[in-house]
Amino acid sequence: VNGRVYLNNQPYIQKLVLDQGYWKESLITAPDEEAYKNDIIKCKEMGFNGCRKHEKVEDPVYLYWADKLGFLVWGSMASFWSYTPQAAETFTKEWMDIIERDYNHPCIVVWDMLNESWGVTQIYENKQQQAFASSLYYMAKAYDQTRLVISNDGWEMCQTDICAVHSYMHGEKGDTAQHLRFE
């Protein structure tokens, strides 16, 4: 509302960690269910109130603990390698299944399906890829009008409820004038 995110009818600042979901012991699957709970508790102890899952559909057990512990989640999808009609069809079916599976988790506050144009590398000029990203946005909205949706997080956003800019400076002094455009 008015450019702000609200939770329980109150303005809410999301302080999120970008969560790759890697586990030292077991790579991208938690070593056990308790690990999910402990991971969320550690994030909260560090001052974060949620996470943006990165290129990973999270296990429902993680979402269960996020629900129980009051930890926000941006539900995400892993990118495909390159755009083809078959890849788009498969991706779309899987994404809709994920939304249907995870819809009832109150921890999810954003659906975030594409990341930085991965898999849709020509989206800036390619009308088919733009239509694909837009269709994902509208399908997510058709399934779930209660959550915010980002069609392509960080870069070329055809349709979006949140303007999320990924700016990588790696220690250099940033161009604050560029970032002020979004205030």
What is the role of each PLM region?
Residues 1-45, 150:
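N-terminal carbohydrate-binding accessory modules
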